[in-house]
Amino acid sequence: MIEHGNSTFDYRSIREVAANAGAGATAGAIAATFVCPLDVIKTRLQVLGLPEAPASGQRGGVIITSLKNIIKEEGYRGMYRGLSPTIIALLPNWAVYFSVYGKLKDVLQSSDGKLSIGSNMIAAAGAGAATSIATNPLWVVKTRLMTQGIRPGVVPYKSVMSAFSRICHEEGVRGLYSGILPSLAGVSHVAIQFPAYEKIKQYMAKMDNTSVENLSPGNVAIASSIAKVIASILTYPHEVIRAKLQEQGQIRNAETKYSGVIDCITKVFRSEGIPGLYRGCATNLLRTTPSAVITFTTYEMMLRFFRQVVPPETNRSDDRRREEERKNLVSRRGEEEDKDLGLRESQTQSNKISTPHIPLGSK
């Protein structure tokens, strides 16, 4: 602990935030790179619907057909459209999420250090809302870059900064926050995923007779995949609505198709029914499940690594405090011994003065 006047600066919280942010960003970047082609396909399915059916007429070839179309029309580079803003967005995304999530859990936990499911959901939702507001512009850019290759008559963005500049110039700040309402509605996803993930980890730790911090990577992978599937299925429709709203401003001088969230939901439901709200869900699960496994497993392992590399400041503070207490104790003991010695010497001198000398042989 570092003291400044009456205020106390908790270095441990800074260390934990840095460790969480570093581990999360590393894990997210690895996962994003691995599953980017599926992310491109999912985004295009959400915005444009199904690709042209293969000539063979076989069913179940949506992903393969989409990949072939992308490679044929845009090359292998097309499979990684939007990767740069995705990775750039993940850095503040995880930094904001885990720092806010950790702080809210500390605030909401009971006096005995336990966190109820309801409090965990509130913490996860609050962190999700803060993250959505902070990073929405980057996700808008990512969506535009992923879909621009298949929009006729669209002047393509040259880079991430080019996309930012043009969106601000042509649509204003509002364009960077298109789709923010369904994004905020999407906090229900993390409000389900994170509490479920932690409960599953606790169950597995209990079954293995170990602590949550010492779970094996395999158990972490299982817990993260189950939690992700549950949350994705329950909350997927908001992703479709968000993608449609984020993408529609890209076509110049085109009539706005959706006036808002409610209008978008109504039109999608009328034209496509419930399946329209789950368009791309299977692809999304194929993308998000391994992504969650990679992200959470890497995150947990990197977090343990960072905690080992950077020992808790509180431990060093405790060591210094114990050393100071030991020195003070030794000093006090020395002072007490000096006082005792002085007292004994004074008593000896007093005895010598007060005791008369009686010569031997006197009567």
Swiss-Prot record:
Where is the protein localized?
A: Mitochondrion membrane
Q: Which species is listed as the source? A: Arabidopsis thaliana
The tissues in which it is expressed are: Highly expressed in young meristematic shoot area, vascular bundles of leaves, developing siliques including the funiculi, petal veins, developing pollen and central cylinder of roots.
Q: Which InterPro entries match?
A: Mit_carrier, Mitochondrial_sb/sol_carrier, Mt_carrier_dom_sf, SLC25A32-like
Alphabetical list of SUPFAM superfamilies matching this protein: Mitochondrial carrier (SSF103506)
Instruction: State the function annotated in the UniProt record.
Output: Mediates the NAD(+) import into chloroplast. Favors the NAD(+)(in)/ADP or AMP(out) antiport exchange, but is also able to catalyze a low unidirectional transport (uniport) of NAD(+).
Kindly give any further remark recorded in the entry.
Appears to be a mitochondrial envelope-located membrane protein lacking an N-terminal-located transit peptide.
Instruction: Enumerate the Gene Ontology biological process terms.
Output: NAD transport
Question: Which residues are listed as membrane-spanning?
Answer: 21-41, 82-102, 121-141, 176-196, 215-235, 277-299
Question: Protein name, please?
Answer: Nicotinamide adenine dinucleotide transporter 2, mitochondrial
Topology versus the membrane: Multi-pass membrane protein
